[in-house]
Structure formats: structure tokens, C-alpha cells
């Protein structure tokens, strides 16, 4: 996209096209959606640019905490909730309510998750979701007699990616994915932003292509694109490269029918400003970044727009 055209206009155009021309269907949640299939957007990361939406406030600190949590390989919501991050609560809460019949509020459930480690261990785990697959993809080793057993330590796709980019930058195999077919049924939610491919330009620029099988354009996308850009910046820094671009491709890109007010408000707004992301410290590895290492500047978004989450 030309530098003179605001990066967010392509997002608003996609939102408008989905709302006007999208195929209306009943979805898994029962809410109903309008969707288009197979859409692509490109976002420059040059000069510290970061694709934060400006037509509504994006709580980028929450997204940052989520990405750092992914990189730990943890799958329990307890460390997130302890930091005030509640974006994953709905799934274990629904499971708890169905299993026990207790009409517990989200606030009380989260308080118990933080206060009681045993309760969190039983009810706060999401299954082998994103981070587990990223850094601990299951491996199997011979157990004799033609049998195999699960190895004690899984395969760290992120560490392998960094090594590959450093030692073989021209490779076309710089890929990691969270889509482990054998584990899908044990996940609270199968990965939406599922496969990442990286590309090193001849001038040392690093680009990331994210394939997202399912995209809630009204709510989830803002976090998805920010985290993809943030991860690209972190990977580039670790590999001595500069961040060039994020290319986003969505499979089923949809708007929920109960997001009409969100769509109307957001399409009435004009994007403005060019936020920047600065990384204050380069740790020895990508797994050692801390929350305080990141600063977003020149971000003056318009007012927050609330909308219900479809579980």
C-alpha cells in the first residue's frame, strides 16, 4: 500500500464490503455472520510503523501480554488473569458452568483462578492451544516393539525459526503453525491465526505472511494484526534484520450480525495518525522479552467501541 494512503483504509474497505456484500450464514456460535472468503491486506513495518487501528481504541498492552504468554508455552489462563487480561476467560468459564451447574459470574471465576492454584489447574487450562504448539509441539520416539511414546520435550518451532532465519535466510521454509490436527479436539478453541511464514529480502528486510483461517474482523483482527507485527519486530531484532512488512491473508473473514452498531460507528470514522513501536531492549533470546521492553508512541485512537464476543 502506498505510503500516502492510510494503512487502515484497506481494513475499513473490507469491513464495508463484508457488511454490504458478504454471504450471510448461520455459524458455529449461532449468532450468524456475513463473510467473504480469501482476503489479503498488507501493512508496512518500516520506520517502526505498527498497524494499530485508529478508528477505535485497541488495547495493545493486553495484546502484548497475550503474545508474551504465547511465547512461554503456557496454556492456563491464570497468569493472564493475574495481569488483568480476561480475553480467554469465556471458554473455561463456560466449561465450568456446564460441568458444575454453578451460575458463577466471570468476576468470581477469575478471582478463584488467581487465588486457588488447584482450582486454576483443574478449570483454567485451555488445552494445547497456540503457545503449546509454538514452543512444545509434541514429538514421539521409538519405544520398542514397533511402538512409539511421547518424548519428554516437544519441538520448539519458534527457536527453530530463529535459527533458520539466522543460518539460512534464503530458505523458503521459515514457517511455524499452531494447527496440530491431532490436538484440535483438546483445544478450547482451534487456532484462528494459525500459520506464519517469514521471508528475508536481499536488503535484510523481514516480512511475515500470516494465514488466518477464521477472522472476526470487528473484534479479533485488531489484536491479530498487532501481534503479528509485534512478533515480526521481535524476530527481526533477534536475527539482526529490519522489519519490512506483514502480509495478512484471511480464509473466512466475517462480521457477526450482532455487531451492526460497531460496524456503523467504525465506518463513520476517518483513520488518522501513524503510531510507532519502539523496543527498548534486545534480550539474549526471543523468550526473554518483558512487558516493559515495548513502547507505543504517537497513538491517539478514537473512542472504544464495545461489542459482544461470540463464544
Swiss-Prot record:
InterPro entries: Thymidate_synth/dCMP_Mease (IPR045097), Thymidate_synth/dCMP_Mease_dom (IPR023451), Thymidate_synth/dCMP_Mease_sf (IPR036926), Thymidylate_synthase (IPR000398), Thymidylate_synthase_AS (IPR020940). Pfam families: Thymidylat_synt (PF00303). Pathway: Pyrimidine metabolism; dTTP biosynthesis. The active site is at residue 192. One of its GO terms (biological process) is dTMP biosynthetic process. It catalyses: dUMP + (6R)-5,10-methylene-5,6,7,8-tetrahydrofolate = 7,8-dihydrofolate + dTMP. Keywords: Cytoplasm, Methyltransferase, Nucleotide biosynthesis, Transferase. One of its GO terms (molecular function) is thymidylate synthase activity. (6R)-5,10-methylene-5,6,7,8-tetrahydrofolate binds at residues 216, 310. GO terms for cellular component: cytosol. Its main location: cytoplasm. DUMP binds at residues 28, 172-173, 213-216, 224, 254-256. Catalyzes the reductive methylation of 2'-deoxyuridine-5'-monophosphate (dUMP) to 2'-deoxythymidine-5'-monophosphate (dTMP) while utilizing 5,10-methylenetetrahydrofolate (mTHF) as the methyl donor and reductant in the reaction, yielding dihydrofolate (DHF) as a by-product. This enzymatic reaction provides an intracellular de novo source of dTMP, an essential precursor for DNA biosynthesis. Belongs to the thymidylate synthase family. Bacterial-type ThyA subfamily. This is Thymidylate synthase. The lineage of its organism: Bacteria, Pseudomonadati, Pseudomonadota, Alphaproteobacteria, Sphingomonadales. The gene is thyA.
